[in-house]
Amino acid sequence: MAKVPSRSPRKRVRKQVADGMAHIHASFNNTIITITDRQGNALSWATSGGSGFRGSRKSTPFAAQVAAERAGVAAQDYGVKNLEVFVKGPGPGRESAIRALNSVGYKITNITDVTPIPHNGCRPPKKRRV
């Protein structure tokens, strides 16, 4: 019986990306931060819920800050230095996520609000009575 040659474990080479894009999706319940390259391929991501916050603590600015720091540190392995930020949604973690990415050491070149605005599409949820 022929012996199958064993594959030696090879170290995977990470591609080096100088410029990236940070997509921040800030909803009322959670904040999702994805860092991609210029083509939109995801390099790293983090969420408030995945960072250890559950329930109503997910929707705090501090949870968004922690998630942005985790995504930012993970993307530094790819050599990302400059970020273009796209913010979507009305959530409380919008500004704190941008500040956290800045504090990690990224040079933020542009901030764009890409929140979808309906041209009178679906009926919005009813107003809360607290």
UniProtKB/Swiss-Prot annotation:
Record keywords: Ribonucleoprotein, Ribosomal protein, RNA-binding, rRNA-binding
Top-level taxon of origin: Bacteria
SUPFAM superfamilies: Translational machinery components
Gene3D superfamilies named among the record's database cross-references: Ribosomal protein S11
Short name of one Pfam family: Ribosomal_S11
GO CC term (a single one): ribonucleoprotein complex
GO molecular function ontology, one term from the record: rRNA binding
GO biological process, one term: translation
Function: Located on the platform of the 30S subunit, it bridges several disparate RNA helices of the 16S rRNA. Forms part of the Shine-Dalgarno cleft in the 70S ribosome.
Self-association state and partner proteins as the record states: Part of the 30S ribosomal subunit. Interacts with proteins S7 and S18. Binds to IF-3.
HAMAP family (UniProt xref): Ribosomal_uS11
Assigned protein family: Belongs to the universal ribosomal protein uS11 family.
NCBIfam families: PRK05309.1, uS11_bact
Protein name as it appears in the record: Small ribosomal subunit protein uS11
Gene: rpsK
